[in-house]
Amino acid sequence: MKILSTIWATLSDLFYNSVFQVNLEFGEDDMCGVLGLVSHEPVNQLLYDGLQMLQHRGQDAAGIVTAEGSTFHMHKGKGMVREVFRTRNMRDLIGNAGIAHVRYPTAGNAGSSAEAQPFYVSSPFGIVLAHNGNLTNTAELYENVCNKHLRHVNTSSDSEVLLNVFAHELRREVSKNANPHRLNIDNIFNAVAEVHRLVRGAYGVVAMIAGYGMLAFRDPYGIRPLVLGSQTDEAGRKSYAVASESVAFNALAYDLERDIQPGEAVFVGFDGTLIARQCSDRAKLSPCLFEYV
């Protein structure tokens, strides 16, 4: 047994060091929980209940953003879900779509309320993003984002860097349009494809683009999990959910549809239309072993 334990410890160390080698100047959110919903009814309580089911994935901080038309409403802070969200906070989270996050920090950002997710950028269109995983080339990405593309990163979180990488690529795609002030689905998926090309490491992402819809995507190796669920109401209208684990759907009375595939992106418009596309030519499932412990 001692020999087996030693072998397991060695393999675990090798796996972690090869896949999750990080720059400790940046905060890395290793095993966090993400959740996203597009519904035909208010989602604030659903997001809260779903986060409670994901609480085991992160106890350091929690956050929710809802979308009311093209307006975002956000509340986030340090602590457990029940500590961060009071009745007055929940009342302010208006809208039929939203994303949420619970954080379990592993380096750099423990104790920082500023690095609670989701993160927000105003351009292009207004984007909020929550991320589970950790990036291995954060320093390089930060250099490009801040010094080359002149974007501002306010924290040491690799998730904020990831958001700015996506935002820059989306802006670049939209600028090619005949009408550079309007977004189309190809712009979104092409931007995700560029994220896959540029970013190294693990990421399961949920995001919202103001006035358009919710986006979810998974790194080309599927290191972190991401699942798709749905619910059909009595009128035949379908609502969609994305989460780090299907256990979140239990609290929502949503059905598990499938895993989001490595390299795949799923976009759900605020009208309830779902479109999915493979955005990587190197997709290969290599999940994190620790997700099964």
Where are these regions (language model features)?
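Conserved short alpha-helical segments that host acidic/polar catalytic motifs at enzyme active sites
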Residues: 7, 11, 15, 20-293
